[in-house]
């Protein structure tokens, strides 16, 4: 198999189902060697099942590609390190890390339990930190040893994290953290030949079933298929994307866009008198753009 990712070794978390599976299959189709990570739990993070990751490995091998399965819980820092080491030990190198694993425990803030908050932050935010921390340390050591590195980190944020969505304070906070993590890690790791980008996907998967997306018309469903998210991730994983880092890409079958992030808006000269702040804020708000809706458009 050959393609734009020929010979590149990719670790993909949460790759047993949904979007992650599409990444694994397309990257393998473009010549990458894949570590298919998946704990195999349900969409709330409960349970374990090795078969989803193993099934994707079998699909890749049937295509003529190379892949191995990994069942690590990415929220476990030590297990995340072992996953990265597995890639290096088995394939002899590591070129790409795709942090995709995730769960949902949606709840209105006033009803959210501490465990629902902790679980989502753990899988999404810590589950991005752990693999990235270990991969980054590996690449840094290669550079210190005189080797040239051309590596990629591809994280997964969400419109809920960069724009907001009701009922997802835990999920949105985790995804907003991942967006910031992406920008900052891009700054820190550029010196080692590592780029860091993220995608904010919109697709119909088992995680979106309770959001009413299953009730969409067939044309819309087709445009929201997970397959549409894989091309940008595959390109970002390739050597062709070398000059792109610190960016968030919003993607569905209908649109590929760059999320422009926070920018300073209108400004005024401040005052040290709190009784004079009201008119200044009113002036600022009159000139400022409104917050975007959950699709990134002005309200």
Kindly give the residue locations of the regions a language model identified.
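Active-site helix of classical SDR
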Residues: 132, 174
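Canonical Rossmann dinucleotide-binding motif of NAD(H)/NADP(H)-dependent dehydrogenases/reductases
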Residues: 2-36
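C-terminal helical subdomain
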Residues: 198, 218-299
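Residue(s) in the substrate-gating loop at a strand-loop-helix junction
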Residues: 158
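The beta1-alpha1 cofactor-binding region of Rossmann-like NAD(H)/NADP(H)-dependent oxidoreductases
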Residues: 50, 54, 71-84, 114
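Substrate-binding pocket helix/loop in short-chain dehydrogenase/reductase
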Residues: 108-109, 113-121
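A glycine-rich helix->loop->beta "capping" turn
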Residues: 6, 63-66, 86-99, 105, ...
